[in-house]
Amino acid sequence: MREVAAPPETVFAVLTDHRRYSELTPLRKSVLEREGEPAPNGVGAIRKLTAVGPALREEVIGYESPGRFSYTLLSGLPVRDHVGTVELTPNGSGTKMVYAVRTQPTVPVVGGLVVAVVKQAVKGLVDGVVKESERRTAAGG
């Protein structure tokens, strides 16, 4: 759980701007391969994210502005049933962000490593989203 000094609308806008992830997070490249509904970054959108190693392809499966966003991993890690969900709730003048990931490594021997990589990736993403959301709020936008 993270406290963000920005309203949920701002945090949601930053969180779901897939094309800008490489500017805000440790990702080297972020591409929107397919647009979704009701917005380009909405349900059905497919994003390709590259840090190190193989690119991750994820599909947006939940887009409820400004409170909830979720995705599933299509390829890039030896896992199955990988779903990430971010819930944003108003908290005073800011936002409480809860980011949860459910995943099942397919190769037990490297399962611990996969979980560690996922945790580090989520931390980098959350840190970038929080920083940009707070920057926008402080700048009045």
What are these regions (language model features)?
Residues A5-E9, I61-P66, E87-K96:
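A short, structured loop/turn motif at beta-sheet edges
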Residues E3, E23, L32-L77, G128-G141:
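Glycine-rich portal/gate segments that line the openings of hydrophobic small-molecule binding cavities
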Residues S65, G76-P78, N91-S93, Q104-T106:
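Short coil/turn motifs at secondary-structure junctions
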Residues M1-E35, K96:
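Hydrophobic ligand-binding cavity/cleft-lining segments
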Residues V79-T85:
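Amphipathic hydrophobic-ligand
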